[in-house]
């Protein structure tokens, strides 16, 4: 079973919208690669309360850590216009991960 990392824009979306999109992406990824996938949980609902200068960078760092576990990375939605998604794409591409995109 392949491990799937989902990269998607989240700004301005509700939890329900994000989770619905993630499920749709999981289904598309399974159809594309022809096998079940295990989704790496990269949707964070908490923030540890640490003092930092940039919360988005903190989240991006956590995402890149999880990206290291992926066999396949799926870029969904309008990812090209999301700064964090573009950085995740660059990392996945530079390190030779299998990339699927909408």
Predicted segments with their positions:
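Conserved catalytic or regulatory cores that recognize and/or transform ribose-phosphate-containing ligands
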Residues: 1-102
């Amino acid at each position: 079973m392949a491990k799937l990392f989902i990269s998607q824009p989240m700004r301005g979306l509700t939890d329900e919208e994000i989770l619905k999109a993630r499920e749709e992406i999981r289904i598309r990824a399974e159809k594309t690669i022809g096998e079940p996938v295990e989704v790496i949980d990269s949707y964070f609902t908490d923030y540890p309360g640490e003092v930092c200068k940039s919360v988005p960078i903190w989240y991006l760092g956590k995402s890149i850590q999880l990206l290291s576990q992926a066999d396949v990375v799926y870029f969904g939605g309008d990812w090209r216009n999301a700064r964090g998604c573009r950085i995740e794409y660059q990392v996945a591409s530079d390190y030779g991960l299998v990339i699927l995109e909408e």
